[in-house]
Amino acid sequence: MPSLSPRLLDLIAAIDPVDHGHDPAGQAHLDNLTKPRGSLGRLEDLALQLHRIQGGARPLAADPARIFTIAGDHGVAAEGVSLFPQEVTRQMVLNFLNGGAGINVLCATAGIDLRVVDAGCLGDDFDPHPQLIRRKVAPGTANMTHGPAMTREQCEAALLLGADLAAQAAADGCRCV
């Protein structure tokens, strides 16, 4: 089996495990908020995870933040497993770029920078747009019912794309991606 690229191995090696030593203080803070314990469900889990990632710092620093909406077509759509036809991917990307999707409302409300990444949409390139990042790994994935959806190289390219996007966001001053 071929090995991972040195760059990907270096990125993986640089990932520090989260420190659970701050969990009691983080959980105590969540439990002392004016709300029933655990009533925020998954949001409380996310807050505790951010608390760990930031080494127990309070308040949590998530501003400025950026969300990457990464778009691509899936070959398995040919099997009729999707609620919508493949063409909807392109329509949704245009909707994101024109500010007409739910993610746009959430980002605008929270003051979060939204970027749309074409990592594998079928068809022609999208017209330039300030929120669009064109980084196609492939023109869609293959149909996983007939074989692997991605090659090993495509998978690695997709992982490195995510790392590149996170690094650029950090360089731009984002504290949360």
Question: What residue ranges belong to the model's regions?
Answer:
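N-terminal loops that bind phosphate or other acidic moieties
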Residues: 1-177
